[in-house]
Amino acid sequence: MKHMKRFSASVVALALTTFGLTGVAPAQAANKTDLVLGVVAEVTTWDPIGANIGHYIPYYQAVYDNLILRTPDGKYKANLATKWQVADDSKSMTIDLRTGVKFSDGAKFDAAAAKANLDSYIAGVGPYTAKLSGTTVSVVDSDTIKLTMANPNPEIVYWLATTGSFMASPNVLKTAGLKTKPVGSGPYTLESATVGSQYVFKATPGYWDKSKQKFSKITFKFLSDNTARLNALLGGQVDAAYLTAATVQVAKSKGKTVTADARAVDYKGLVLFDRAGNKNPALGKLEVRQALNYAIDRKALARAVEVNAQPTTQIFSPNGTAYSKSLDSYYSYNPTKAKELMAKAGYADGFTLNLNNWAETNLNALVEGYLKAINVKVNWVQDTNWYANAKGGKFEAIIMQIFQGTDLVTAETAVAKDGGWNNLKYESSAMKKAWAVLSQTGTANQVKVQTANMNRIAVEEAWFVPFYRVLHYVGTSNRVKATVQAQNAVPYLYNYAPTGK
């Protein structure tokens, strides 16, 4: 998920503000050994339990090591884990651990430390902790652990390479201090933090993997405003910055290198949470949800709002096997058919749809116009905390830009009953049956078959109103090279390298 909004946690924010140096000077892209990133998000906790993907994960990669490293093309390689083996049924995993690694406070990394971290994560409540729920960890010997899963977890390696295994010192696990001051074994140490402004990291002396320590200092400069972030890149205040469709061409015209992820990491569209019709009875009607899909002119919308967006009516990525090209255009633009479906559902006169006030006003206006044409009135809910409230089940539907992970990750996140983007816990009989089959076996073939089935069900039952897949852009100065990361909005921290200029 790649939300572009800063979410505050007042207690944590206050503590983070007081950590580190005061009066920190604004970051400057000053020399060949430093890196300054213009970022759109900032962390609200350093506890690995709260680790998130997308724009957040580079923060955690600065101070923590994962057990497994995910390469830019989405493959896996050794990190704190030197090798691993997952059972054929995906219900157990044995991991050999690297020796000789210490945390920044001097504590030793070993099997006991790895178990303590995984136990803490599994017991915690965070954005993706549920992905390891039902997992028990046992120490085999000083440098080996074994994971045993209650149910098949074919994506266990993915989760251990992303949010599920950031290793903190066992001395600080489950302490309040970990929320504001990270203590890890990572390539960098947090030197200072000014909430709402910048986070400065210094290279950790004696770090075990110099290939991940390409800069002596890294600064994350928080710039939520798209124009401000562009200006910082153009003015030399940052070396690299996340760009939007509206700022890409300007950056190119000023001589900046723009790297695009042609794999289209995210999709943008409506997430119809209330498919049971408990909050808004109209959304409980299949015909209404299908009508909403027919009402949107995706090609025109993409041309008006984005750069090189890919119109689609499915949420699964074209990089996976669950994807079907035919599902990209399952719902053509057909307002006449939409009206017929509305009438069939008993809503010829329309209804009111409550949506979050999404940041792109031009997109909002166009969507509102398309829906008005079939007698659906949009009520834009003014809620500065809409993201958290949506996660808490308070919205019937939202406009959102959400990441397309691997097939099973997308399925677990979007169409599982307990998925992070199935906030009202909806489950149709067809989807329930597909999950029942998959839960019996974690074989690669069943994952392939059932995720494709789930994709088809979600489209036919109109769980979503996808608009298009979105390309992500990173602008860089001539001092830095950035390599895009598979299934992530921005490059991983390790994917930036100095050019020597």
Give names to the regions the model predicted.
Residues 85, 89, 96, 129-171:
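Surface-exposed binding/hinge segments that line
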Residues 296-322, 359-368, 388-501:
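Detector for C-terminal structural segments
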Residues 82-125, 140, 146, 282-283:
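Aromatic- and charge-enriched surface segment that lines or borders ligand/interaction sites
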Residues 75, 161-213, 217, 335-336:
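Gly/Pro-rich hinge or "lid" segments in bacterial periplasmic/extracellular proteins
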